[in-house]
Every structure is written in structure tokens, then in C-alpha cells.
């Protein structure tokens, strides 16, 4: 691919914020997005922005008692577009951004900070009930149904006497029918655990040697296809989730991408083979996954095992001197993307020529 044909990553709008921003998410079916974080005075903040004529207009600012670490629209309907958030005190709240004074759902989900959140079953993505998963420093991963008060529908925690590991990232997947659904969780010691929610079992686990910062399936609402895991020390791994070997697990390929921590991975909603990683040195890398000629082969005993593909770098850009801590593609407009970084900036990016890859 020549330099002229390659996608370009263009910083379209930059906005400096007056607080530390931890997460940003597009509001579905709109040119709006939310940013979440904490003010220096120790309170939490949610801001709603809209893109208007090449600039950002602040539509709403909501201040809450506790700093807000993460949020998702993944379990809401397209009509309501409620935002679910996790905060520093372990609370899970669901907000109607039109009337945000009181949450529409509230539960003290964890004993410590909720580091990570994901949703499925809303927005027309994933079969089955809407659910939210949260992961916390208290070592537990909990699945919540917004229609059920107080208690999680599933609770994955270490057994008595086992060390509690800090859970840094969670992701839903495999939600291709009413029954099937998995949650993948990544921990500070490099553990990755795949929980099967249908029969409430640990389906697979592995360790990638470095703390797992971000996990994402290429699609939540299909039979598991690929999983990307990013980590400290600048590495990420792509697992082929189609074929699970009884002892070797899933085949994977790893890539040393950034000079420092890879904070985030996000797959392009319009093409699941393309994904963006965000690094600790303020850089973004755009990748494409290439499948092998055959995705599975038989081992010496005739048991099916997966074959990993390869990853190629399409483009990279440095936006900031500080880590890019969150990243979100627009579900509606191909190539439109937002990211936030620890220099208290939110950026709207345009990635060009994505239809040509």
C-alpha cells in the first residue's frame, strides 16, 4: 500500500478540559459524546458535547459526589440512551442525561473503585437481556441486569484464600443468541479469564506476563471470532477465538506496538479486522488483522487447534505527550473517533480511506 493509499489519522477538533478525563463515549445515533472524570476538588463530572460546524458545543455538565472512572451506553435502548457509569467509591449508576439529578438505577456494586464497565443487549447489539459488567480493584467481576435491583446476576470473585487481583478491564462477547454470552476479564498480574455466563463456568484462562489494560472482542454479537488484549510494556495480543484446544487454548499472535503501556484497543464498528490502539506516550496505532489461509489444523493426536493470523500497521500518529487513556469509534460515521488523554484534552479524530482496506 503506497503512502497515498494509506489511511490518515487527522486531529479534527481539540478541546482542553478543566478536569482529569478518564473515559469518553459516543452517544449512539447522534453527533454527541460524553466525557467523564474528576475535578481537582474531588468531585465527579459528566459532560455532554455536540459537534457543531467544526467545533464542540457543551450541552450539559453534571457534577456528582464521587469521581467517575468509566461509562457505557451498551445496555440501553436507542430510544432512552441512558449512560451507565462506575465511580471511585464502587457505585454503579445509570443516568438519564436529560434529567440527571437522580440516577434511574443505583447500586453499591463494589467495595472499591470500579475500573472498567461494558454493556450488551442494548442499542440492538447482542441477543438477550440488557446487561452491564463491572470490574473493580476489589478483585470481583459482576454482571448486572438494569431491571433487577440490588443484586448482580453473576459474581466472579476469587475463592476463599486466593489473592485478590485488581481487575482492569472487562468485555462482553459471544452474544449471538438468547442463551449464549461470555465475559472476558483482564487483571493487573497478566491474567485473562473467560467466563461463560450460560453455564456459569470459567471457560478458559491464560497469562500474558504483563498487566492487561484493555480487552475487546472484534464484535460482541457474533460467535466469538477474535479477542485483542493490550498490556503494560507496549505489547498486545490477538487471540483467534474460533477454535479452543483442550490444553493449548486459543491460538494468538502478539505485537510490540508502542514504547510504553497500550492503554486501549477499539475495533472499527464497520470493519472488524481493523482496530486502533492507544499508547502511554500519546500515540495511536491503526492495525489490520490478516487471517491465515486455514484458521485451524489438527495436532499430532488429531485434535483441532487454532492458527493465528498476522497483524500489519496501517498508520500511526502522536497526539500528545501524555497517555491516551480512552478511545471510542462513532458507531454511525465510519472513521469518526474521539479520544481523551491525561493532558486534560479531548480530541475528535477523522481516520480517512477506511473503506479502501
From Swiss-Prot:
Keywords: Apoptosis, Cytoplasm, Repeat, WD repeat. The keyword Cytoplasm applies. The keyword Repeat applies. It is found in: Dynein axonemal particle. Pfam families: WD40. One of its GO terms (biological process) is apoptotic process. Component of the PAQosome complex which is responsible for the biogenesis of several protein complexes and which consists of R2TP complex members RUVBL1, RUVBL2, RPAP3 and PIH1D1, URI complex members PFDN2, PFDN6, PDRG1, UXT and URI1 as well as ASDURF, POLR2E and DNAAF10/WDR92. Interacts with PIH1D1; the interaction associates DNAAF10 with the R2TP complex. Interacts with several dynein axonemal assembly factors. This is Dynein axonemal assembly factor 10. The gene is DNAAF10.
Amino acid at each position: 500500500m503506497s503512502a497515498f493509499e494509506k489511511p490518515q489519522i487527522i486531529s479534527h477538533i481539540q478541546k482542553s478540559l478543566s478536569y482529569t478525563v478518564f473515559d469518553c463515549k459516543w452517544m449512539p445515533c447522534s453527533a454527541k459524546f460524553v466525557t467523564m472524570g474528576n475535578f481537582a476538588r474531588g468531585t465527579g463530572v459528566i459532560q455532554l458535547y455536540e459537534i457543531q460546524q467544526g467545533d464542540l458545543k457543551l450541552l450539559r455538565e453534571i457534577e456528582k459526589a464521587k469521581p467517575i472512572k468509566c461509562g457505557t451506553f451498551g445496555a440501553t435502548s436507542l430510544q432512552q440512551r441512558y449512560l451507565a457509569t462506575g465511580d471511585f467509591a464502587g457505585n454503579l449508576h445509570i443516568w438519564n442525561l436529560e434529567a440527571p439529578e437522580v440516577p434511574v438505577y443505583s447500586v453499591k456494586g463494589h467495595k472499591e473503585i470500579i475500573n472498567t464497565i461494558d454493556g450488551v443487549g442494548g442499542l440492538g447489539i447482542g441477543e438477550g437481556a440488557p446487561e452491564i459488567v463491572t470490574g473493580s480493584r476489589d478483585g470481583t467481576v459482576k454482571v448486572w441486569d438494569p431491571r433487577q435491583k440490588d443484586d448482580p446476576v453473576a459474581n466472579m470473585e476469587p475463592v476463599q484464600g486466593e489473592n485478590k487481583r485488581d481487575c482492569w478491564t472487562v468485555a462482553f462477547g459471544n452474544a449471538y443468541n438468547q442463551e449464549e454470552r461470555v465475559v472476558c476479564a483482564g487483571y493487573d498480574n497478566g491474567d485473562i479469564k473467560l467466563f461463560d455466563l450460560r453455564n456459569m463456568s470459567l471457560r478458559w484462562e491464560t497469562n500474558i506476563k504483563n498487566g492487561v489494560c484493555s480487552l475487546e472482542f472484534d464484535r460482541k454479537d457474533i460467535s466469538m471470532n477474535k479477542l485483542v488484549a493490550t498490556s503494560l510494556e507496549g505489547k498486545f495480543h490477538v487471540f483467534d477465538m474460533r477454535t479452543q484446544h483442550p490444553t493449548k487454548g486459543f491460538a494468538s499472535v502478539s505485537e510490540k506496538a508502542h514504547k510504553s503501556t497500550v492503554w486501549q484497543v477499539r475495533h472499527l464498528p464497520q470493519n472488524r479486522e481493523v482496530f486502533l490502539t492507544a499508547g502511554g506516550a500519546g500515540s495511536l496505532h491503526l492495525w489490520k488483522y490478516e487471517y491465515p489461509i486455514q484458521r485451524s489444523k489438527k495436532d499430532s493426536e488429531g485434535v483441532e487447534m487454532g492458527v493465528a493470523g498476522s497483524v500489519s500497521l496501517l498508520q500511526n500518529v502522536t497526539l500528545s505527550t501524555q497517555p491516551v487513556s480512552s478511545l471510542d469509534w462513532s458507531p454511525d460515521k465510519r472513521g469518526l473517533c474521539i479520544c481523551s488523554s491525561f493532558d486534560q484534552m479531548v480530541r475528535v479524530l477523522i481516520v480517512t480511506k477506511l473503506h479502501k482496506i
